[in-house]
Swiss-Prot record:
Cross-referenced Gene3D superfamilies: Ribosomal RNA adenine dimethylase-like, domain 2 (1.10.8.100), Vaccinia Virus protein VP39 (3.40.50.150)
HAMAP family: 16SrRNA_methyltr_A (MF_00607)
Native organism: Haloarcula marismortui (strain ATCC 43049 / DSM 3752 / JCM 8966 / VKM B-1809) (Halobacterium marismortui)
CC annotations in GO: cytoplasm
Keywords of this entry: Cytoplasm, Methyltransferase, RNA-binding, rRNA processing, S-adenosyl-L-methionine, Transferase
Protein's UniProt name: Probable ribosomal RNA small subunit methyltransferase A
Binding site residues for S-adenosyl-L-methionine: 29, 31, 58, 79, 107, 122
Methyltransferase is among the record's keywords: yes
Protein function: Specifically dimethylates two adjacent adenosines in the loop of a conserved hairpin near the 3'-end of 16S rRNA in the 30S particle. May play a critical role in biogenesis of 30S subunits.
Family (UniProt): Belongs to the class I-like SAM-binding methyltransferase superfamily. rRNA adenine N(6)-methyltransferase family. RsmA subfamily.
Gene Ontology MF terms: RNA binding; rRNA (adenine-N6,N6-)-dimethyltransferase activity
Length: 285
């Protein structure tokens, strides 16, 4: 078995042993840069993240899996490609037998997830948003690879160009930080864009909302008209937010909030408006 200077499996050799190339049509881009792979677990240990049971989504040929096994007590790897799932079982036979590695073959958006303590994953770009927002409500630390543009929008502050629905939604569940940008050369095959590693740490918001589901629907609605004032955004998007009486919300809300645009409001501002909308806007049951 070919190993690196640190004693871990060589990523390129893992790809060769898997006997299958990445399918870019399925957004598969294998992380093969040893230096990046070695740093990823360090971002978890530096933050004192509990690594007793790590969930990895999109394990592919197993380069990150190998690094995680060197750090974590247990790893559950979710892989939807049956060929790569079979390769992982063969490559890590000893770890599977020792109950340190569990391979779950299936779609991460559909399978039952274990009771993990953290998720560390190089996500397929096409499903990264859906996977992230399946994981964030679990209130566990996450280290996830995204396209850089998506990552920067996740971590954006209010009133910045990148700030939007994604920023508010992610920040509702966690403190979000871009810890490293990763060039295309770190992957095989190389993607056309730069990637970024995001670390999220669960947080309790400093505001309350009537329900997470209603809050998310309200955000989705008003950010479809982010260039309009909130007055117009609330009125024009009742078909999305489910409000039966959006005019009642506009009349009851603070004028300063109603005259602002979505990109200028803080998460707490949105929570205030969502709570008011829930109370007076006659939302659908």
């Amino acid at each position: 078995m070919t190993t690196t200077e640190t004693g871990t499996r060589d990523p390129d050799a893992l790809v060769r042993r898997a006997g299958k190339r990445a399918d870019t049509r399925q957004d598969q881009h294998f992380l093969v840069d040893d230096r990046v792979l070695d740093r990823i677990p360090e971002y978890a240990t530096d933050a004192d993240i509990d690594l007793s049971h790590v969930l990895e989504i999109g394990a592919g040929p197993g380069a990150l899996t190998d690094r995680l096994l060197a750090t974590a007590e247990r790893v559950t790897a979710v892989e939807r490609d049956p060929d790569f799932a079979a390769h992982l079982r063969e490559e890590f036979t000893e770890e599977v037998a020792a109950d340190r590695l569990t391979i779950v073959e299936g779609d991460a958006l559909e399978v039952d997830l274990p009771d993990f303590t953290a998720s560390i994953s190089n996500l397929p770009y096409g499903a990264s948003s859906e996977i992230a927002f399946r994981l964030l409500p679990e209130q566990r630390p996450l280290l996830l690879m995204f396209q850089q543009e998506f990552a920067e929008r996740m971590a954006a502050d209010p009133a910045t160009d990148d700030y939007g629905r994604l920023s508010v939604t992610a920040g509702h569940y966690a403190d979000v930080e871009v810890v490293e940008t990763v060039p295309p050369e770190a992957f095989d095959p190389q993607p056309r864009v730069t990637s970024a590693l995001v670390r999220t740490m669960p947080r309790t918001p400093d505001y309350t909302v009537p329900s997470d589901d209603f809050f998310m629907d309200f955000l989705k609605a008003v950010f479809t008209q982010r260039r309009k004032t909130m007055r117009n955004a609330v009125r024009n998007t009742a078909h999305i937010s489910g409000l039966g009486d959006p005019d009642a919300v506009v009349e009851a809300a603070d004028e300063g909030l109603m005259s602002a645009r979505a990109g200028k409001l803080t998460p707490a501002d949105f929570a205030t408006l969502a709570t008011l909308a829930y109370e007076v806007g006659q939302p659908e049951a």
